[in-house]
Amino acid sequence: MLLCSCAVRGTASNDAKPAAGDVTDSNAAPYEVPAFRDSVFNEDEATAFGSGEIDLSQLEDGIIGVKAQSDTRLKMQIVCGEDKYNYDLPNDGSATFFPLNMGNGTYTFRLMEQVGDSKYACIGSEDRDVTLKDEFQPYLRPNQMVNYNKSSDCIKKVKELDASCTTDADIAAAVYDYMVKNIQYDTEKAATVQNGYLPSPDETLKTGKGICFDYASLAAAMLRSEGIPCKLITGYVGEETYHAWNSFYVESEGWITVEIRAKADEWQRVDITFAAGGMPAGEIQNDSEYTTRFTY
């Protein structure tokens, strides 16, 4: 799995001063948060899949569930067209959820079992035509990389943050502001993190520190739970720095910080890790520096 080895650039620590959302009407109604979208493994809908089961009942919602048991390592491979994602899969029978993040098309789902040091054999395969309800579905619910549920502490925290928000842009600003001020970059963790690491939004919230992968996962969890589509993206900043950041979509225009204004009905890239490290907004907003490799 992916390893984020970015380093925070800039000289400040947590001294960035983003503004709250651009609330101009004190009499505006509070933002109405839509129903919580969960990822649920439907036992009645699941079918045999190699040494486990696969739930394909939520394809239009942009998510699948898989669980399997094995004495060896397992991987889940998802292919659509020329794109391919490989994930580690727990071998203890616990359900894990994966996004259908390659748009509409014919998907191939493969369960892979380790047969050598770096060799895997396919022990289960399913093909399905996928038509999503809309492009936002995969980025509105939990998955392996953005792992949370309705009872998660990070979801309780964002409920506190949204109390005075009247638009989705206000909520995005509140989450951005909270994370920049309260989550510190963990340089020790960045130097020792192992390949295959999975972020825990609640752990990041609890410890108040993390690497770029942690920042991006926590932000995505908070925003998704509020009905705001949010991608967790990994790739390169410049030519050598492997990094993680977010892209979110709001229906209302509004200030995210004093220098960043989100446009309505457009995807907006944000890099909270670098913002927390004091990097100037002009550098963070330079899209030419960012190259996407994977999206979750």
Regions found by a protein language model. Name each.
Residues A190, L198, K209, L232-E239:
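Catalytic cysteine-centered active-site loop
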Residues G52-I54, E188-Q194, C212-F213, S217:
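Short N-terminal helix-initiation segments at or just after the protein's N-terminus
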Residues I171-V175, G208-L223:
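Active-site nucleophilic cysteine motif
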Residues Q144-T207, I256, D265, V270-G278, ...:
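Secondary-structure boundary elements
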Residues L2-T167, W255-V258, D287, T291-Y296:
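N-terminal accessory/pre-domain segments preceding catalytic cores
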Residues D214-Y296:
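Hydrophobic/aromatic-rich core segments of domains that either
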